[in-house]
């Protein structure tokens, strides 16, 4: 079981990454992000000096992160944004900005593979490039895949501006571009994301009794979007939450029917926590490439005290 302590992670990030020493003692370089929640082997560093990655590793601008076939890794950025890399993926963070777009917050470049990301609202957007595509987004989530046959882009929430050599479009929440190339006319390629990862919990109205933790059954099912019609599809699931006193399994996998059931343990908030208002948000994504046709699962659970 892995304890999700987002506030602790945030504090640790700023304590550790406010400055990162380089060779000259008179000069420091701020870290852009931190590596976390690694599965299998991951490498990180400058392109010609990559080393085996580890949880808590500080990532500087121009660093690359590369996952092996069964590898996964989460990158937490210092602005609060988050990226989840899937297997056989290579991404540059803080990549060099083009002359006409120096005003963007920072730039990511996908060399190969696939990732999911959520980018928080900011004064300037984040830019993402790869395969002849340029994306700009803020306060939005997306899945981005680059393969030999084309590019897949899906926007589960928010809005993303996408452009290539011949055209540009605004992808709204629930829309995607499937197998597009740098010379395609993008407005003709827009379609809806057809499926969704649905979540529900038992009991549906949990109650804290004193200081005792609760063990709850959490269910997953891929369904046709807008319906409860099941979709038979196996795959790995990545689960996260905005609550610090929550334990979840390290691994969740849907069976061939597209279903899964797991147990999560939720403890009451700390006695001195005056910010907790009783609602815990659970957010799940398909944790591998090839699932750009499945929208994120989102569940808000209301807890009461007895």
Q: Regions from the language model: what does each represent?
A:
Residues 202-209:
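Short beta-strand segments of immunoglobulin-like
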Residues 223-248, 276-278, 295-296:
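Short flexible loop/turn segments that cap and initiate beta-strands
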Residues 290-306:
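Short beta-strand elements
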């Amino acid at each position: 079981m892995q304890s999700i302590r987002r506030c602790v992670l945030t504090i640790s990030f700023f304590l550790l990454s406010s400055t990162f020493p380089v060779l000259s003692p008179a000069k420091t370089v701020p870290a852009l992000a931190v590596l976390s929640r690694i599965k299998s082997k991951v490498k990180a560093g400058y392109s010609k000096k990559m080393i085996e990655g580890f949880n808590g590793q500080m990532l500087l601008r121009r660093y690359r992160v590369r996952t092996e076939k069964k590898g996964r890794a989460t990158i937490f950025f210092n602005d609060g944004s988050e990226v989840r890399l899937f297997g056989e993926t290579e991404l540059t963070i803080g990549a060099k900005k083009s002359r006409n777009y120096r005003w963007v917050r920072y730039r990511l470049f996908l060399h190969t593979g696939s990732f999911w990301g959520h980018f928080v609202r900011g004064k300037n957007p984040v830019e993402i490039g790869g395969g002849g595509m340029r994306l700009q987004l803020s306060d939005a989530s997306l899945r981005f895949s680059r393969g030999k046959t084309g590019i897949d882009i899906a926007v589960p929430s928010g809005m993303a501006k996408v452009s290539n050599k011949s055209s540009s479009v605004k992808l709204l929440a629930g829309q995607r571009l499937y197998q597009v190339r740098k010379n395609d006319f993008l407005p003709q390629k827009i379609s809806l994301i057809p499926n969704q990862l649905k979540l529900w919990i038992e009991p549906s109205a949990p109650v804290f009794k004193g200081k005792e933790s609760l063990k709850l059954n959490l269910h997953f099912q891929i369904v046709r979007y807008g319906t409860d019609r099941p979709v038979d599809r196996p795959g790995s699931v990545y689960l996260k939450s905005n609550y610090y006193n929550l334990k979840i399994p390290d691994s969740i996998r849907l069976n061939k029917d597209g279903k899964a059931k797991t147990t999560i343990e939720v403890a009451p908030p700390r006695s001195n926590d005056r910010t907790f208002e009783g609602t815990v948000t659970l957010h799940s994504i398909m944790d591998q490439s090839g699932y750009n046709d499945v929208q994120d699962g989102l569940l808000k659970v209301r807890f009461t005290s007895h």
